[in-house]
Amino acid sequence: MVYVVYIGKESTAGAAWELLDREGATAVTMRRLAKSVGITPMALYRHFEDRDGLLNTLADVGFEELAARAGGTAMPADAEQQLMKILDVFLDFALEKPRLFELMFLERREGARQFPEDFREGRSPTAKFVAAALERGMKEGSFRKDDVWEITFET
């Protein structure tokens, strides 16, 4: 008797999360992922265009989670303290999920947002928090006036 089992995008993404968390982005290959969920590598291409698409999906979910944390954090009134609070949220996330943070911010990924265009156009769900705190501080005189996005990526 032959059984057909449908492995959905959620199960493959879950297995990809486990690989990423245990071994880092270099371990997340289509072949290893397929083997871990019991399907052929070609079957994964129904859910993800390629390995870059898979890694970008994982990174995007991470950015959404980090943005939700930053957006859900009570912020102090002082711009300098607000910036420190946002950076604390980023640091806590990095310590809690180091491999994901590395994928999000340190790994070169095909299709990742490009500086400065994508950031100036508001396409980053996380950088906007740092930029907003810096801009506020510049307007209030807490920080010297400068290019907000250049400073955001130096922070």
Question: What spans do the regions from the language model cover?
Answer:
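Amphipathic alpha-helical packing segments from all-alpha helical-bundle domains
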Residues: 114-140, 149-153
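Generic hydrophobic, amphipathic alpha-helix propensity
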Residues: 8-16, 33, 58-66, 70, ...
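Short, intrinsically disordered or compositionally biased N-terminal tails of bacterial proteins
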Residues: 1-6
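Hydrophobic alpha-helical connector segments
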Residues: 71-100, 149-152
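Helix-turn-helix
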Residues: 11, 15, 19-53, 57
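Amphipathic alpha-helical segments used for helix-helix packing
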Residues: 95-114
